[in-house]
Amino acid sequence: MNKISQLQLFAVMLCGHAFSLMTFFPYTFDNPTEYMIGVLISTAIEVLLAVPAVIIYKRFSGLDPCSLAGESSKGLRTAAGIFYTLTFFYFAYRVTGNFVYFLDSVLSGYFPRALVVVSVCAAAVYLGLMKASVIGKTSGIMLALFALFTVLVIASSFSKTESDFLSFHLASENITHGISEAVRCELLRNLDMVFLLFFLPKLRGSPVRVSALYLGVKLVMVELSVGFVTVMLGDFAMTSKLPFSSMASYSTSSMIERFDAAFMAVWVILAIVRLGAVLHCSADCIKAVFPKADRTLSVIISAAIPAAAAVHKLTAYDWESTAYDMSGWLLTVTAMLFVPLVIAAFVLLRERREADVRGA
């Protein structure tokens, strides 16, 4: 049975956000405090973004947006399929590119980027072809490993140095701008919420509980992680490309000298899990556009096109223009709020017209 439980979907979404959290904190912020305030505001906005998923679940028996659009017309289904396919392509493009770019920051910059992309995409394609329940179980295991790794690193960091809480300040030239940038940044990183829409038909349970649990735990996870990194690294937390990696290198214990290897292991598998879930959903969207499309081919295409674009950008040494571009937050809002509501409105209008015809 291709079903996924509430906890499994929660794990899929949180694993995705954990990867983006481990990847980097943008250097565009003057201090961590304004970023933490922005995270709080963005979470409140994300509560509103979850409303369309709840409406679709209760009013339309949990259809995904593309299937729901098909209830109105074939043309609307095709349009929805194209939009969400491109959304997941962009999602895969950022995941793949960010992974390889920030791998450059940890390892030598002279390894073949294309080979790394092919390796990661091959593993993600394999996972993307699995059933939703398999993706959910894999995410659950990885979420547990991420939690264990985080606890060990934080505990080891506290045992090595004194905590410096003076780094929590609001000394900034433009606090309002910094907070608004943080809000946009978190909305962009939270493209994982789109999973909520496309796992609806396979979900055993209510999206209300999943979204509430995810947003609550995500808020606590991000705030505590940024807080601990700030306490350990100070202002360096906002200038380091990989503050989690820096803290892992800095942390030590009586049994483990450094946590770099653990960081890399958890980070790589989180990237594969996140990309695998993206490819799984992207194949569903391609099916809405081309009903006779082979699923295996759809998953491979969903990985190949974004990967090729990412490699082209990486080889031109121009990935920073993408990595630190926050305009993608509009895509999260559009994909989660506006498009589902427009589709639902078209379906309701058709139902009303059909009811009027029957009543005439």
Regions from the language model: what does each represent?
Residues A114-L115, L127-S157, G328-V339:
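Membrane-interface loop-to-helix entry segments
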